[in-house]
């Protein structure tokens, strides 16, 4: 089973409450507003700030383009 992208319509970044985008290649949910990437483990998003990694400036720019 794969991550259900329909979830993106109802979940939000827990830090900034903004929209999340799915990075299929890295299996992460991306919040450019909070500059965080949340892992998706076994098709389950882990929306905990302490589990997220910080996005680099280059990554933020990539996702915003």
Curated annotation (Swiss-Prot):
GO terms for cellular component: cytosol. This is UPF0434 protein PSHAa1659. Gene3D superfamilies: 2.20.25.10. It comes from the Bacteria. It holds the Pfam family Trm112p. Belongs to the UPF0434 family.
């Amino acid at each position: 089973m794969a991550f259900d992208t329909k979830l993106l319509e109802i979940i939000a970044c827990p830090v900034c409450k903004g929209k999340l985008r799915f990075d299929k290649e890295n299996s992460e949910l991306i919040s450019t507003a909070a500059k965080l990437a949340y892992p998706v483990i076994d098709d389950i998003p882990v929306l905990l700030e302490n589990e997220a990694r910080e996005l680099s400036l280059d990554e933020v720019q990539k996702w915003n383009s």
